[in-house]
Amino acid sequence: PTGLCTGSSGLLLTAVVCGDAIGWESGGREHIARQCTNGVIAAATHARDTNLDDINVDAINGLASQLRAYAEIAEYLPEVRPNLRELARVTRRVTRKWLRNYPESPDDAGYAHSTAGVLDAYLAASHLCGATVDTVLVEQQVQAILAAIHATGNVSQGWCHGMAGFGFLAAHLCDHIDTRAAGESLLSAIRPGLLAPVDHLGLSV
């Protein structure tokens, strides 16, 4: 496994953050940097050479999760950045194609395995490689998410399928002027449920 939550990219991210916080053993930083660079190259190659139907795109352990892990790693290890740009280009192409081919009103539009997480990866990849964001596609996907929220009627506050995940996407949409309106419309829809007082947030559901 190579994903963020149960795979090598998540372990590498943990090693990098810990190494930066408590200090590296002799040669440790260079060793981890090589592993990270190899991981970025492998992720880009796999996504480039594999049919869309055979690619796990999701934000838990798929391509979207790897992009997020290695983008964070690159903040600590600048030597990873040159290859990260290629991973971003490939991720942008794959996520854009996935979004265009996904049903317009999925039953689950959540962050972990569906539209919200893939759209967030598309945004991140576009900005990382300096490409223009397809604002029409973004608006279509946000409308699909809103339709799924309204159709469900009782969306959890959790991260994987619920309000917390949608809020994470909305915050990133609002970071950029060309997608801010879409982010604000999503925030407006989830605000009452996201901020309602509860005994248990259930971040994993």
Identify the function of each model-found stretch.
Residues 1-41:
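Well-ordered mid-protein domain cores that form the structural environment of catalytic cofactors
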Residues 1, 30-52, 85-105, 132-153, ...:
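Long, well-ordered core segments of solenoidal/helical folds
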Residues 115, 119-122, 139-142, 163-170, ...:
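A general structural signal for well-ordered alpha-helical packing
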Residues 54-121, 127:
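Solenoidal tandem-repeat scaffolds enriched in leucines and small polar residues
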Residues 11-25, 66-79, 117-131, 165-180:
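Well-ordered alpha-helical scaffold segments within catalytic/enzyme domains
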Residues 4-10, 59-62, 112-117, 160-165, ...:
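Glycine-centered tight-turn and secondary-structure capping sites
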Residues 156-157:
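Interfacial loop-to-helix transition and helix-capping segments at the boundaries
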